[in-house]
Structure formats: structure tokens, C-alpha cells
């Protein structure tokens, strides 16, 4: 497959990130590596979307802290960014609504072709960029081309930073412009996939926890990339849910022959390590995140 015929993917991870750990970043990296190895996908960006303060989880620190920690955790990455939209809303948003927001945002801002899992590639949806948004293409030697789209993102200001392999410049499509018969559109299929661990996948099997229509949209329209933790049996998990069984082909399980130590890192372990003064916290959290936590006195006296 050529680069333009491969499915271009943005990985979106929703969660508390309380705090964000090295395991979260490892999940992004492993998913991108695995998707590239399949030869069917090109991962052009990753989005970290922390949950709203009203989520109600015990011990959840305010979003201003979680957003800052997430930004510190990804500051050295050239393809993962933090998105504050979910935190800036008036109330908690479902995972389904977050996915739909980013799909609609990409249509408006990037001008790329957005499609659901079940959308035929012969009938792509072409996004129309906003007039005030310009694209900056930065070429680097032996690296991907970083594309940064600046502008107003819904009701908040932010940045979309996507990375993709070198290719000819993408043609933005303005349906209101008189482009003439000579204009050719470069069609690049773009999908937003939910990135998660096996614990979130298993939560789909808990009766009443998820709205079934939301599950249909998440798994059936968008699709999921699962990075298993602690040797979880994803096959068994999927067989316990009718929705997961129905859309099994839309669930990509990242297979790894080697159990990486980052796969057992969790926010809970990190908080406990902080509370107990455990030096192993450096194995769980990046140093900038640790420094911020200590400076802000987070989690030190919190429970769980």
C-alpha cells in the first residue's frame, strides 16, 4: 500500500490521568508502533483528553493540575498533544461525545477526509477548513512532516499537532471556491480511534455502566485500539459483550511478545508511591510531572 492509500489515524485516549504516567505514554508509543507494522495504517497524531472535574471520581485533582501534568508528560513528544476541550465543558462528557467532537473538529480545521469504520472509501467526507486557520508544514531530515493547524477550536483555543510521513502537500478543499476542472483533490482517509487499556475494554462488559447506543458508536463507527495490561485475556473480554463480538473486526489488539514493565504502571500505583514516599515513583512518572506534583503538594495526603 502507498502512503496515501493507507488509513491515517489519530489515536484519542480519554481518562482521568490522575496523574498521567509513563504507562500512558508507553501505550501511545506501542499502539503507533503496532499499527505501523501492520502496513495498513499511518498514525499522524495522538490526543490526551483528561476527564471533566465533575466526573466524581474520589481523589480526582482539579483539571488545571491534570492538564498541566499531561502537558509536561508529552512536552518532548512531536506527535502527542493534550486537548483541554473535555475539561472546559460545563459538565462531564461521555467518551462518545468526545470522539464525535474531535471528528467534527478535524473536519472543520484540517480539511482532511474523515470517515467512520463503516464509511466506504468511495464516498469520503471532505472537511472544509476555517478561513482563519492556516497550515504550517515543517520538513525535517529522516523524520515525519509535522503539520500544525492553528486557530480557534470550538469554544477554546488550542493546537492540533499531527505528524505524518513525507508526502505531497495536502490540498485543502473549499467547496465554495471556483476551483476549475483542472483541480485534483488528494483523498486521504483519516480515522479517529479510541486508544485504551484492557481495563476499559472490560468495563464494556459491566451491565448498565455504558449506554449501549454509545458503545455502538464507539466500537462500530470509530473503532478501538487496545493495549492489554497485566496479560489480560482480551479474547475472553470481547466474547462477554454482544456489542464487542458484533464489531470484533473494529477492535485492534496490540500484541507484544514481551511483557514490558510499563504495562503494569498505573495512576493508582503512582499515587500510593507518592503517599508513602516510595522512590519507585520515578519508574512510574516522568521527572517534570514529579516536580510539579511536589511543588503543588498533590496526592501527598490523598486517599487511594
Curated annotation (Swiss-Prot):
Pathway: Cofactor biosynthesis; NAD(+) biosynthesis; NAD(+) from nicotinamide D-ribonucleotide: step 1/1; Cofactor biosynthesis; NAD(+) biosynthesis; deamido-NAD(+) from nicotinate D-ribonucleotide: step 1/1. GO terms for cellular component: axon; cytoplasmic vesicle membrane; Golgi apparatus; Golgi membrane. Its EC number is 2.7.7.1, 2.7.7.18. The keyword Magnesium does not apply. It comes from the Eukaryota. One of its GO terms (biological process) is NAD biosynthetic process. It is a lipid-anchor. Divalent metal cations. Mg(2+) confers the highest activity. It catalyses: beta-nicotinamide D-ribonucleotide + ATP + H(+) = diphosphate + NAD(+); nicotinate beta-D-ribonucleotide + ATP + H(+) = deamido-NAD(+) + diphosphate. It is found in: Golgi apparatus membrane; Cytoplasmic vesicle membrane; Cytoplasm; Cell projection, Axon. Its cofactor is Mg(2+). Pfam families: CTP_transf_like. A lipid is attached at residues 161-162 (S-palmitoyl cysteine). InterPro entries: Cyt_trans-like, Euk_NMN_adenylyltrnsfrase, NMNAT_euk, Rossmann-like_a/b/a_fold. This is Nicotinamide/nicotinic acid mononucleotide adenylyltransferase 2. It comes from Danio rerio. The lineage of its organism: Eukaryota, Metazoa, Chordata, Craniata, Vertebrata.
Amino acid at each position: 500500500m502507498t502512503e496515501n492509500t493507507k488509513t491515517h489515524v489519530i489515536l484519542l485516549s480519554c481518562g482521568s490521568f490522575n496523574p498521567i504516567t509513563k504507562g500512558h505514554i508507553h501505550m501511545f508509543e506501542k499502539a503507533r508502533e503496532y499499527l505501523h507494522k501492520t502496513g495498513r495504517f499511518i498514525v499522524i497524531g495522538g490526543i490526551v483528553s483528561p476527564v471533566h472535574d465533575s466526573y466524581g471520581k474520589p481523589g480526582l485533582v482539579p483539571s488545571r493540575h491534570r492538564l498541566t501534568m499531561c502537558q509536561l508528560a508529552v512536552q518532548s513528544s512531536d506527535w502527542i498533544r493534550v486537548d483541554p476541550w473535555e475539561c472546559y465543558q460545563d459538565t462531564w462528557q461521555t467518551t462518545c461525545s468526545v470522539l464525535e467532537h474531535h471528528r467534527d473538529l478535524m473536519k472543520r480545521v484540517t480539511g482532511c477526509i474523515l470517515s467512520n469504520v463503516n464509511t466506504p472509501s468511495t464516498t469520503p467526507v471532505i472537511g472544509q477548513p476555517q478561513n482563519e486557520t492556516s497550515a504550517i508544514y515543517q520538513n525535517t531530515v529522516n523524520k515525519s512532516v509535522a503539520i500544525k493547524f492553528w486557530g480557534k477550536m470550538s469554544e477554546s483555543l488550542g493546537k492540533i499537532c499531527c505528524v505524518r510521513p513525507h508526502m505531497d502537500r495536502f490540498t485543502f478543499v473549499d467547496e465554495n471556491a471556483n476551483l476549475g476542472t483542472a483541480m485534483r483533490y488528494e483523498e486521504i482517509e483519516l480515522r479517529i480511534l479510541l486508544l485504551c487499556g484492557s481495563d476499559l475494554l472490560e468495563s464494556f462488559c459491566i451491565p448498565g455502566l455504558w449506554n449501549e447506543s454509545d458503545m455502538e458508536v464507539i466500537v462500530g463507527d470509530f473503532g478501538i485500539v487496545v493495549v492489554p495490561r497485566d496479560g489480560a485475556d482480551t479474547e475472553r473480554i470481547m466474547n462477554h459483550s454482544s456489542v464487542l463480538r458484533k464489531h470484533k473486526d473494529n477492535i485492534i489488539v496490540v500484541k507484544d511478545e514481551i511483557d514490558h514493565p510499563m504495562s503494569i504502571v498505573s495512576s493508582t500505583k503512582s499515587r500510593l508511591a507518592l503517599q508513602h514516599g516510595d522512590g519507585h515513583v520515578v519508574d512510574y512518572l516522568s521527572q517534570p510531572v514529579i516536580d510539579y506534583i511536589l511543588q503543588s503538594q498533590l496526592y501527598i495526603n490523598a486517599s487511594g
